[in-house]
C-alpha cells in the first residue's frame, strides 16, 4: 500500500489531521512533468510551475492548517523517475505547535531515479515551546541521481523572545545510494535540555540547519568554494564525506542561515544540477 491508501484507512479512526501526499515526476522529452499526484487530507500541491522552462518542474507543498499539533500524522512521498528534475519547497515556515500530550509526526520519503535531480528545499520549521514531534526523512538515490536537500529548525519563537523550555523534538535523516547508506543521523532536542546550550549542540542559539548534497561529482574543490562563503551571523561550516557534502549552520535567526544556504546553493547548483540558481518566487513573498 502507498502513503495515500494507508492514510485513507486510518483517516476516520485517528485524532488530529491524518494527511498524505504522493507525487511522481517523469521526464518526457525535454520536459519534467508532474505525472502523478494523490492526496488525502489537507496536504496538497496546487499545480506544477515552470519558472525556469520545461526542464525543471517546481512544486509548492501546501499544508493549509499551517502547522502540526499533537495527534497529527503527515506523510509525503516523492518519486523522481530517471532524468527528471524537480524542485520542491513550501510557501512559508512550517510550525509545530504546543502539544497537550500527544505527538505530531511528519514522514518524508524521497526516491531519486538514475540521472534525476531532486532539490528538496522547504522553508524553516518553527518548534513552539511545549511542542512534541517526530520528523523523519528518507532519501533513496539510484545510479547517478543528485539530491540537494535542506532542513532548518528554530526552537522557540525567537522573534518573540520565546525559548524552547518544554516538550521534545526528534529528527531522523537517512540518505542511501543504490542501497548503500551515505548519511544516517538521529537526534532529539528536549525542551530546557542541555543540548540547547551545549557547545556540541546549539550553543545557546535557537536555530540549527543542515544542507545535504549527495552527488557522485561533489569534490574537494566544491567544498573549498563553500568554505569561502561566510555566514553573516551565527556559525557555518562544511565538510566532505564520500559522495556527500554536508553544511551546518547554527545561529540567532533563520534569515542569516537561509541567506548562507542560498549562497551555497548558488555555488553548487550549476556544476551539480546543470543550471544557474534561481530563487523560487515564493521565497520572496
UniProtKB/Swiss-Prot annotation:
Indicate where this protein resides in the cell.
Cytoplasm
Q: Does the keyword Chaperone apply?
A: yes
A Pfam family that the UniProt record links to this protein: UreD
Q: Which UniProt keywords apply?
A: Chaperone, Cytoplasm, Nickel insertion
What GO CC annotations are associated with the protein?
cytoplasm
The record's annotation in InterPro entries points to: UreD
Record carries keyword Cytoplasm: yes
Function comment: Required for maturation of urease via the functional incorporation of the urease nickel metallocenter.
- Family to which the UniProt record says this protein belongs: Belongs to the UreD family.
Q: How does it assemble?
A: UreD, UreF and UreG form a complex that acts as a GTP-hydrolysis-dependent molecular chaperone, activating the urease apoprotein by helping to assemble the nickel containing metallocenter of UreC. The UreE protein probably delivers the nickel.
Q: Which PANTHER family match?
A: UREASE ACCESSORY PROTEIN D
**Protein name as catalogued:** Urease accessory protein UreD
Specify the species: Azoarcus sp. (strain BH72)
What taxonomic lineage is listed for the species of origin?
A: Bacteria, Pseudomonadati, Pseudomonadota, Betaproteobacteria, Rhodocyclales
Q: Which gene encodes it?
A: ureD
